[in-house]
């Protein structure tokens, strides 16, 4: 890793070794999240905790150096999510400040007073970011939230004031829309990485109590969890976050799972967008009717269906319309069959009538259902007896 060796005599050698280490460790190893496969809710969160815990702890002074890798804009300036000041690394480090753009410092986006400023949380780069000193000071240890009537607005549009989000009326700090998802995923990381201790943080300050419950799941008060879910949805993972996640993996040897897998937010907490699974790759074969006993062989391929929707008409194949993703069909001519059954009996039909059937595979459920409708849809017709 980039900091496994602490002392180098020759500066040129230090630069070479750090660069080489970063190149080797920027991406997670194959199978990094295997232990989380197939889990959801609290079990998934605990599996992720076991994957990302025991990170390499850095010193507080080293954060200044780390920011030069984790939070550098394309123009070489500090990537400050609280201002548009254009800080230069090292040269503009705080120090004292009186006004916005005086200097940048080390912002605990998850306020350090909430966990009593103790290690390893106080130097965990996944919630520490370089920000304008003045704006950081105005934010103080207030929770994130939405503000309709700000008492303070920063140069880039961050706001401080009474919370306008339902469920809380205290003072909050609202970052700009471009970074709300970044901060939400930072908080999901903190709730997961420190699930072994976070249950005791709610009593450390009034502000912490407004956001945290006294448990390790679901961790957050309902209003705040809903807020984070909305921010996560409306500001999806950006290339900035992906690059930062890779850079921090090279430094800390752990990752933010909710950047690598945004769907984990829904799978753990049930907020944010439901993951959209890929549609089944193939249709089932041998689809046929025997006295309105429908039979088929299940679809195969890398992505298997969760089930099938069979649509029926007594007019023609053309009268059967393709289903729409996200819609459930429960009418008298629609039949849902789970994957693996490979048959359906349909009874109480009119005698001496020809019925037409089409079969659509799907993945997911509810509003997240995704039907396969392209290509040649399996169809069959069958006439009932007298």
Go through each PLM region and give its residues.
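Domain-level detector of nuclease and nuclease-like folds
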Residues: 96-105, 110-274
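Recognizes extended acidic, P/S/T-rich segments that occur
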Residues: 309-351, 364-375
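Bacterial N-terminal signal peptides that target proteins for export
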Residues: 2-13
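N-terminal signal peptide c-region/cleavage motif recognized by signal peptidases
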Residues: 18-23
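Hydrophobic beta-strand segments within extracellular beta-sandwich modules
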Residues: 357-358
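N-terminal module-boundary/linker segments of secreted carbohydrate-active enzymes
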Residues: 24-87, 268
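Pro/Thr/Ser/Gly-rich low-complexity, intrinsically disordered linker/stalk tracts
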Residues: 272-307, 351, 366-386
